[in-house]
Amino acid sequence: MSSNEPVVLDNGTGYVKCGFASSESPIVFPSCVGRPVLRVEEALASNSSNEKRSVVGQECIDNRQNYEISYPIKNGIVTSWPDMILVWEHAIYEKLGLTKEEIGNRMILLTEAPQNPRKNREKMVEIMFEHFGFKGVFVHVQAVLTLYAQGLLTGLVLDSGDGVSHVVPVIDGFTKRQATKRLDIAGRTVTERLIELLGRRGYAVGRTSDVDSIREMKESVCFVAEERKRWLRLARETTACAELYELPDGRRIKVESERFMAPEIMFEPSLVGVESVGVSELVFECVQECDMDSRMTMYENIVLSGGSTTFPGFGERLKKDLVDLYTDRILKGDPNRDVGKFANRVNVETPVDRKYSVFVGGSVLANIMKDNDTFWVTKREYEELGIEKAMKKCEGTFHE
């Protein structure tokens, strides 16, 4: 790795993925900050600041009983800048091992959510220059980077991570803001739903210390049912979907219909009281809001991204739902119109490494840009032009 290799930093609600432009895979850690839970007398006796006693990432998760944990990113948007700086310091100084001197010779590529407010984007850049001292900064939309990882410039991205799901149409590298959809249901919500469903059957798994164990269970045994009613019948009448799972503390849990009913909330949010259509209908609505001549291209290039799309059966369910919606709403159920032609053209890409597609796409782009400073917003431009004018260099990557 050269001394001026660009840094790539993908900021997720639940996890940060960081590395360099040449990295084949990212370093991943929880995007959280933990502050010690102190008794009253300890708090009164303490003269040190909370910031000095804060921990970041896996350490506070492993010792969550001792910390009050907060996440600086909520539903894809930064809500606490002091905590976000702590997370970035952990990524840049500790995980990547960079010194202040090394940072001054490097560029950094940051990712942002599809509907990130302009003021947040500018704040990110300001911190990278003023607090860290990077030589140059570039900010790119996560959905576009997902397509870059697939070698595409046009397509529709369904990205679902830990805290939020987005459906984003991209045409020639530009996102269509007006057609972008958001659902505040993703991995964390599915974990909470699994805890709730298991609790209904008498399993006491609602303790704070159980959350990570149940998340691991979710990732191990859950799947998306292509036909929910059929699987519910199988769960009632057979043991076809029953699986015994052992928690790290030795407790054994028999998981049955919970395996598919937990992730079902992504397709039917009303199951948890959320007034929204599910991801399949969001994809359908998104495509229908695109120009007529680009709709079929969208259907032919649907790309899944993020850890919450990795449930077995996710892609198959999405395609089935889209064909059903097209048959019902476009063909109006007309038996004389051939839905088979449409079904054959719907293509849902399920990249093996889609947990890290955004980071991979960022690495690809940073590699292309690394030897040309004119691509980046440089510190000199930032100081001479101000943040608003300097950021115009990147506006072509932002939303239409």
What does each of the following model-derived ranges do?
Residues 9-14, 150-152, 157-165, 170-174, ...:
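A short acidic Gly-Thr/Ser loop motif
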Residues 171-273, 300-301:
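Phosphate-binding glycine-rich/basic clefts of nucleotide- and phosphate-handling proteins
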Residues 2-127, 136-138, 166, 176-180, ...:
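Conserved phosphate-binding loops in N-terminal lobes of ATP-dependent enzymes
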Residues 196, 204-243, 334-335, 339-400:
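Acidic, glycine/GT-rich loop-and beta-edge segments that sit at the periphery of enzyme/chaperone cores
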